[in-house]
Amino acid sequence: MILADVLADYEKQLEAVGEEPEALSFVYRGLKQWDLTHFVLQLRQEVSEEDAELLAHVFSQLKNHKPAQYILGYEVFHGLRFQVDERVLIPRPETEELVDLILAENPSTDFKVLDIGTGSGAISVSLKKSRLLWQVTASDLSVDALELAKENAKLNQVDISFVQSDVFENISGSFDIIVSNPPYISENDKDEVGVNVLASEPKMALFADEEGLAIYRQIIEEADKYLTPSGKLYFEIGYKQGQDLKGLLSLHFPDKRVRVLKDQFGQDRMVVMDDEK
């Protein structure tokens, strides 16, 4: 059977169980290390026994709701490759927008930055790669996540200080920027989360108490002890949380400017607190 027919058959079955049918081609191409042109040229070719087994294995994992990036073992984020597995969330495009915003608003070369809840290290590594003179500290409650983040820093050849910490518990010093993309999904919104996300991605990195606001509240209540006088806070948020977080920040920092910004899909996705009121 030719590759196009094998893919078409499996893709119908994936669609029937609610999975993205194109994920199969995405993973197969990645595992074969083929560019798009080579992949298209192979579509009319007979599938070898070895490749038939590979496709069947990938299909089985996708059908059982394993995310494509976990099967591949990596995700590309902000132009960099990050190893990902079940220890961490898969970095999302919306988070790239947060990184771009921080870089655009902060051209300074000598900032100290803290990334709380670093996960795979996507935010901290991307910032450091673009601002080599910044001193970047990345923390996470999960020791397993930190191990993977360290591997990603090494893979992308950047020097970052990693700290195991529950928010500020083991953090010292003051920072020009504190950024966080913490767990922010409320248990009440569980039905909005994809099946493959619930099946595979770490729950402690997804869900938070207090309608998803618990970790933000922890950070906001202690942030003044760790920010420089002109320090800034950057959060990624759930699309329903913008006004709640704006209220919390305005309450604790009445003299600061607080902005709620939308992502490329028109949803509230970032909250920024800075000194430019």
Residue ranges, per PLM feature:
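Mobile active-site "lid"/loop adjacent to the S-adenosyl-L-methionine
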Residues: 184-215
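Conserved Class I SAM-dependent methyltransferase catalytic core
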Residues: 210-274
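Non-catalytic accessory regions of SAM-dependent methyltransferases
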Residues: 1-47
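Active-site beta-alpha loop architecture of Rossmann-like, nucleotide-cofactor-dependent enzymes
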Residues: 69, 185-188, 240
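Short loop/edge segments at beta-strand edges and connector loops
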Residues: 72, 163-165, 262
